[in-house]
């Protein structure tokens, strides 16, 4: 009898330990972000925050160089993106990129002895990434505001950013008895180790799939086309948001009504633009580089590395806690004439997008 009691006690203890293994131990800090008593709180684990702070520090910028004198494209050959800078500022920008992206490898990571040579794929990719950065800093200010981004925002001293994603490998169904997992039930890290669909990125950050699944009526109306699988993918994406930014649901949503834009936090509109920015960058910049990258840089299905929220945020609600690095590097915005042309071309799209978060149907989840 005593042995049975001991075994039962041990079983209960082991089960309890297993159930609590995924929980954070107290204490945690709560920051009120809405009206009292409504649960609008931001939960912060001070121990996790202490570990994160050193990784979110922006490097000190060197003083901006003299902008007088000949332009870089007048002195150097094959300077296609940063040619509008002075020679001094161009040299400063190149030194900064080396420190941000390849501090160990140095200039040779992208260049041969002939600096004008484009034989290294790294140089071709970096040129396109500079154009991408310039676009983000001028045409996606609804998401990055005046803070902008630099190469360091994503790379953090690594030639390949740590936080990237590839299309998930399809299930190998060589034997019918294993069943069809339907892209979920794998406890993937990207969806918080849950059974949710483990590739929400292809659906929402590459394809133009609507994230909206939340209803605003007590009973079904028959007008919603969302099904359970789409709802699960949406929640998978939300789990990614939470981990990527180190926040809980109430950072963007009012839990009184997830579908309400009027009662949501301002960050929800910022996230709405962020979703569309990620799609733009993945489809118009990353996908076009698929054939440029060597095979060992591609994913298991042969696709190119792509961007999600973690690529920039890396666990912080604002990348580098909002450090304004871009303002110190004029080369990370296009030449004035090109910037003006881009702004005029993008104006109709931006005008329509500006109204979208508040003017569309109130069933949006993000």
Curated annotation (Swiss-Prot):
Could you tell me which Pfam families the record lists for this protein? CytoC_RC
Name the major location.
membrane
Q: Signal peptide position in this chain?
A: 1-22
Give UniProt keywords alphabetically.
Electron transport, Heme, Iron, Lipoprotein, Membrane, Metal-binding, Palmitate, Photosynthesis, Reaction center, Repeat, Signal, Transport
Q: Does the keyword Metal-binding apply?
A: yes
- Lipid-acceptor residues (S-diacylglycerol cysteine): 23
Q: What positions does the entry give for heme 1 binding?
A: 94, 107, 110-111
- The positions annotated for binding heme 4 are 143, 309, 312-313
Subcellular localization: Cellular chromatophore membrane
Q: Where does heme 3 bind?
A: 238, 249, 252-253
| Role this protein plays | The reaction center of purple bacteria contains a tightly bound cytochrome molecule which re-reduces the photo oxidized primary electron donor.
- Known partners and oligomeric status: Component of the photosynthetic reaction center composed of protein subunits L (PufL), M (PufM), H (PuhA) and cytochrome C (PufC). The reaction center interacts with light-harvesting antenna complex LH1.
Q: What is this protein called?
A: Photosynthetic reaction center cytochrome c subunit
Q: Which organism is it from?
A: Rubrivivax gelatinosus (strain NBRC 100245 / IL144)
